[in-house]
Regions:
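Beta-rich catalytic cores
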Residues: 29-32, 53, 71, 78-79, ...
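Residue-level detector of Asp-centered blade-edge/turn motifs that repeat once per structural unit
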Residues: 38-41, 85-87, 135-139, 203-208, ...
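Conserved beta-propeller blade signature
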Residues: 43-47, 89-92, 141-145, 210-214, ...
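Asp-box/WD-like beta-propeller blade repeats and closely related beta-sheet repeat scaffolds
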Residues: 71, 80, 96-137, 193
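Blade-level signature of beta-propeller repeat domains, shared across WD40, Kelch, NHL, RCC1
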Residues: 374-398
Length: 398
């Protein structure tokens, strides 16, 4: 389906960014736009988690490269989150699989009605069922998140955890598949990374040649274990954490442990004998970076462009889809500087006020929730919003 609208270069002054940066709203009211990708021609593609007029993918085209995206093209009759484009194919995910579309000589999708299946039949239990994906550096493998539908891997109706947590056999991690083989099924994959309740934000760091993932933390400590956790602790724990997976089998520890960013320790989950103080997970990974609880990291991008100032080169941008009771902040894009593949400074807020209201003293409903990130060929940063359906372009104006 083709669509046209009457756009203009709308400067989004309500979005707060560092001095020298400018934010423009290149589209709005698109629907539940999740992850993004940008072609080398500068066309922006977004995946929708809910169909809009029967379509789950939208292409935004700036035909004359003037910064105004005057054309829309809708296709793909399946909802989902993951999306990516390279020189040969356009890729998109449903909640059960990943598909690819061949590109023509102009970098356009040759036939929007003829996707090929890379993998299908992945577990989908209706909750935390997004299938974000990423390729490794040499494009030999594709890595797909399969989130857990059970927040703490607790036996229903009890306060006890499943021990062992059988969910980890088919969820709670990232699975590796052959990137160049068609019609694969779940059983063809390798569980590459485990111990991740739900990693909506995953990426391949080209500098370290390794997989990075942003883990959504569990919740409801006080609801089920008031003897160990106060309501405030329940609001402020556990950390939302960034992990680096260097090899198959690396384990972030869920559901047996969680990371407490206040104690700077891996703590045994109460379902498995913990009391909020007992440490564990000696064999589990330590986080690369720990963020406040319940911020909902939904995408991560390592910046490779040259448009932004030097401090941003190879650093990590993270789109946060929720808010922190601890900070009274949320719905923002954060930045972590990196040097030689390691964080070189504290995380900071890069783009803020997507919410459109002061979260410490809200006066109205939330307006926008950052969800996806993408880098354009000119080094611009794109941010999707799956609440208001806007897409933003952040540029550095020298």
């Amino acid at each position: 389906m083709l669509g046209m609208f009457l756009p203009s270069l709308a400067i989004a002054q309500e979005i707060k960014v560092p001095t020298g940066f400018q934010v423009s709203e290149i589209a709005k009211e698109l629907g539940a736009t999740r992850h993004l990708t940008v072609s080398k021609q500068g066309h922006v593609y977004a995946k929708l988690s809910k169909l809009k007029d029967g379509n789950g993918i939208v292409q935004l085209k700036d035909a004359n490269q003037d910064g105004v995206f005057e054309g829309q093209k809708w296709f793909g009759n399946y909802p989902g989150t993951g999306i990516m484009i390279d020189q040969n194919f356009f890729y998109a995910a449903s909640n059960k699989g990943v598909f690819r579309y061949a590109l023509d000589a102009n970098g356009e999708i040759a036939d929007i009605n003829k996707p090929e299946t890379i993998v299908d039949g992945l577990p989908d239990h209706g909750r935390d069922n997004a299938k974000p994906f990423v390729f490794d550096r040499d494009k030999k493998h594709i890595y797909v998140t399969i989130g857990s539908w059970n927040d703490p891997c607790r036996v229903p109706g009890t306060g006890q955890g499943m021990n062992p947590c059988v969910i980890l056999d088919s969820a709670g991690g990232v699975w590796q598949f052959d990137a160049n083989k068609l019609n694969q099924r779940f059983q063809d994959g390798l569980r590459y990374a485990t111990g991740l309740k739900n990693a909506v934000g995953i990426t391949w760091n080209q500098q370290t040649n390794s997989l990075f993932a942003m883990a959504h933390g569990r919740g409801q400590f006080h609801d089920f274990y008031p003897q160990y956790y106060t309501p405030q602790q329940s609001q402020e724990l556990p950390a939302e954490a960034m992990y680096e997976f260097k090899k198959a089998g690396d384990d972030a520890g869920w559901p047996y442990i969680y990371y407490d960013h206040k104690q700077n320790k891996k703590i045994v989950a109460p379902e498995f004998g913990g009391d909020g103080k007992k440490t564990g997970g000696e064999k589990a990974l330590d986080p690369v970076v720990a963020f406040p609880a319940h911020m909902g990291p939904n995408d991560i991008l390592f910046y490779s462009g040259n448009q932004f100032p030097a401090k941003y080169k190879h650093g990590a941008f993270i789109a946060f889809h929720g808010q922190s009771a601890e900070l009274k902040k949320g719905y923002l894009v954060a930045f972590v500087p990196f040097k030689n593949g390691k964080p070189s400074g504290k995380w900071e807020i890069f783009a803020d006020n997507f919410a459109g209201t002061d979260l410490a003293k809200p006066t109205g409903p939330i307006q926008h929730r950052p969800c996806g990130l993408a880098e354009g060929p000119d080094g611009s940063l794109y941010v999707s919003d799956d609440l208001g359906g806007s897409i933003y372009r952040i540029q550095y104006k020298k």
